Curated annotation (Swiss-Prot):
Family classification: Belongs to the polyphosphate kinase 1 (PPK1) family.
Transmembrane spans: none
Function: Catalyzes the reversible transfer of the terminal phosphate of ATP to form a long-chain polyphosphate (polyP).
Alphabetized InterPro entries for the sequence: PP_kinase, PP_kinase_C_1, PP_kinase_middle, PP_kinase_middle_dom_sf, PPK_C_dom2, PPK_N_dom, PPK_N_dom_sf
PTM comment, free text: An intermediate of this reaction is the autophosphorylated ppk in which a phosphate is covalently linked to a histidine residue through a N-P bond.
Positions of the catalytic residues: H435 (phosphohistidine intermediate)
Source organism superkingdom: Bacteria
Listed GO MF terms: ATP binding; metal ion binding; polyphosphate kinase activity
Protein name in UniProt: Polyphosphate kinase
Cofactor: Mg(2+)
Pfam family, one: PP_kinase_N
Catalytic activity: [phosphate](n) + ATP = [phosphate](n+1) + ADP
């Protein structure tokens, strides 16, 4: 593709975001156990990065090696740059863990016991634990012509054991593989009386390396090293050929664990000839091998903060508030009848959203409920309420997105449970993921002595997921505005039925009007700037990649429009380039909570148009998904969105990172007054 305007590389941008996440682990202002958690989050993010983005790059290189990336690099050059940066990031991650975080944890009485530090009593306890709890579950595989190298599961923990001697059949033993079943605990607590520390732990890998000889009796163990293979986890479902998406997906899910290898992780002391064998068996190159000083899966350390009762080493707990208009109302419908309600999570509770649905399930006046589900978790009170509504005779329709990445199995299970109680379940539109967050409740009310149907709607920027609603920043709107409700009704009709494109009056919807409306709104600011009027665009999102939107923003900058972008993750736009984007700033907020809301602000000659949305400015959101953006019209709520969603981020000088024109980020230096967006909102709303 020819690049008219400069773009930054997507994969490098994703790694840049993870560098900012990892920087939280180095921040002494962050509580110690939370610093460990940020290291684990970085590992989890990198796993998905390799499963999806790096796997995609490898496939493109194989299929079309001469192609260019959207930013104009050759695929191979881009891949080499990404690998180099990923290797540096992983090295920094493990260095931070071993040189900073683990020593600090030890000072606080939280210790990971290595086998070479065990005394006799600890050794005996560890031996008994291995023999009683681990050995019965483990299956050693000796490698010979009758036992080929196993195809290890995606991201599973494995041990390669170098052996010497002959087995019971007289075969020369050379190498064995032991796969650790996912059911085995990766972290085991040592009894405090034995440990000598308030919280002593032993890693599964430590048990294995010390006692693996029990699995290969009468053989000499020369070495035992852990390794992990990351595989391509994209599911392939031919949506043009299938007749039942759920059945097709159920057939494809098991293959996810056995896709092509994209990364090999090995412990740093693994012998070179063993590494070569693992690479050969995985069909990987040396550059795809990541040698790590410690556990090959740091994600499993995520449980440590939950196992350690040390509130002083964690973020202070908070109680999300409930708006007085809700707390003082007899029921949720009464509160919404009094006017639109804006909820700002996690500072304001997600509970009113659940209560709206729970009350609707029991209310005899409610005749129908329609709901979209993208991610909701395995244990969801929201889904329980939908099933209760169906059992109570309500007309319940749920649009379940089966292709929500890594939540496919959960959503299949929910779809089955919903159908079992009589709910109508549809899977959206083939070829377009349904990412919109919508709830529609139809209620029979009496107005002026006459029975009529009244609609109530909840629209959000984030998922209907109670757990992540305490971890992600999102806005939600509850309204009975009949224009918005009518639009939501039409979108649901479109998702569940078959028909032509609908005319919506208030909502912007992808893949139809969302992208054109964004471009039109930016161009209106350009026209105002050229006419000598004040012009401004402020947008907050997770990612900015779509080339035509970026081109429009460049043109806006050249016309004199002030553009402030708050992009948490990857941003392909280059800010601050003279003659191109000197009027554009890009910042990323990384803190306790995951910044997740999407906000579009256009000055509009003083009218100040504000839209909330589930959509980032990416190709997939604007063209290959069903998304909605909804306006905030009520003046007080609009001021809140601007103040709480945009202004606090633009003023943040503690957790903000400013993007430079070369794509790198630097922390915004604190001024005389320290301003932290998330801490300020916690202080304002929470107790």
């Amino acid at each position: 593709m020819s690049v008219r305007y400069p773009l930054l590389n997507r994969e490098l941008g994703i790694l840049g975001f993870n560098e900012r996440v990892l920087a939280q682990a180095a921040d002494p202002q962050v509580p110690l156990l939370e610093r460990l958690r940020f290291i684990c989050i970085t590992s989890s993010n990198l796993d998905e990065f390799f499963e999806v983005r790096m796997a995609g790059l490898q496939e493109q290189i194989r299929d079309n090696p001469g192609a260019l990336t959207p930013d104009g690099m050759s695929l191979q050059h881009a891949y080499d740059l990404v690998v180099e940066r990923a290797q540096r990031l992983v090295h920094r991650q493990y260095t931070m863990l071993h040189e900073t975080v683990l020593p600090a944890l030890e000072q606080e009485g939280i210790y990971f016991h290595a086998a070479d530090t065990w005394n006799d009593e600890q050794l005996e306890w560890a031996r008994r634990y291995f023999l009683d709890e681990l050995l019965p579950v483990l299956t050693p595989i000796g490698l010979d012509p009758a036992h080929p190298f196993p195809r290890v599961l995606n991201k599973s923990l494995n041990f390669v054991v170098e052996l010497e001697g002959r087995d019971a059949f007289g075969r020369q033993a050379v190498m064995g593989i032991v796969q650790a079943p996912r059911a085995l605990p990766r972290v085991v607590r040592m009894p405090q009386a034995l440990s000598g520390f308030e919280h002593g732990f032993v890693l599964l890998s430590t048990f294995m390396q010390r006692f693996v000889g029990e699995l290969f009796p009468q053989l000499v163990v020369k070495s035992c090293n852990q390794f992990r293979i990351t595989r391509n986890s994209e599911l392939f479902v031919d949506e043009d050929e299938i007749t039942n998406l759920r059945v097709a997906l159920q057939g494809e899910l098991p293959a996810r664990h056995l896709g092509n290898a994209v990364r090999l992780e090995v412990s740093a002391d693994t012998p070179a000839h063993i590494v070569r064998r693992l690479l050969e068996e995985s069909l990987l190159d040396e550059k795809d091998c990541y040698r790590v000083a410690g556990s090959v899966n740091l994600v499993r350390l995520m449980q440590i903060p939950d196992l350690v009762d040390r509130p002083d080493l964690k973020f202070a707990p908070f109680t999300a508030s409930i708006p007085p208009v809700i707390a003082n109302a007899p029921a949720m419908f009464d509160a919404i009848d009094d006017g639109d309600i804006l909820l700002h999570h996690p500072y304001e509770s997600f509970q009113p959203v659940l209560e709206l649905l729970q009350q609707a399930a029991k209310d005899p006046s409610v005749v129908a409920i329609k709901q979209t589900i993208y991610r909701t978790g395995t244990d969801s009170p929201l889904m329980d309420a939908l099933m209760a509504a169906a059992r109570n005779g309500k007309e319940v329709t749920v649009v379940v997105e089966l292709l929500a990445r890594f939540d496919e199995e959960t959503n299949i299970n929910w779809a089955s449970q919903l159908e079992a109680v009589g709910a109508h379940v549809v899977y959206g539109v083939v070829g377009h993921k349904c990412h919109a967050k919508m709830m529609l409740i139809v209620r029979r009310v009496v107005e002026g002595g006459k029975a009529t149907l009244r609609r109530y709607v909840h629209l959000g920027t984030g998922n209907y997921h109670p757990r992540t609603a305490r971890l992600y920043t999102d806005f939600g709107l509850m309204t009975a505005d009949q224009k918005i409700c009518e639009d939501v009704h039409h979108v649901f009709q479109q998702l569940t039925g078959i028909g032509g494109e609908l005319t919506l009056h208030e909502l912007w919807q992808s893949p139809f009007t969302l992208h054109p409306r964004i471009i039109e709104s930016i161009r209106a600011e350009i026209d105002n700037a050229r006419a000598g009027k004040r012009a401004r665009v402020v947008a907050k999102m997770n990612a900015l990649l779509e080339p035509t939107v970026i081109a429009a923003l460049y043109e806006a900058s050249q016309a004199g429009v002030k553009v402030d972008l708050i992009v948490r993750g990857v941003c392909a736009l280059k800010p601050g380039v003279p003659g191109l984007s000197e009027n554009i700033t890009v910042r990323s907020i990384v803190g306790r909570f995951l910044e997740h809301h999407r906000i579009y602000y256009f000055h509009a000659d003083g009218a100040e148009e504000v839209y909330l949305s589930s959509a980032d400015w990416m190709d997939r959101n604007l063209f290959r998904r069903v998304e909605v953006a909804f306006p905030i019209r009520e003046r007080k709520l609009k001021r809140r969105v601007i103040a709480e969603g945009l202004s606090v981020c633009l003023g943040d000088n503690q957790s903000a990172w400013l993007m430079q024109s070369d794509g790198h980020y630097r922390r915004r230096r604190a001024g005389k007054t320290l301003r932290n967006a998330q801490l300020g909102l916690l202080a304002k709303f929470c107790s």
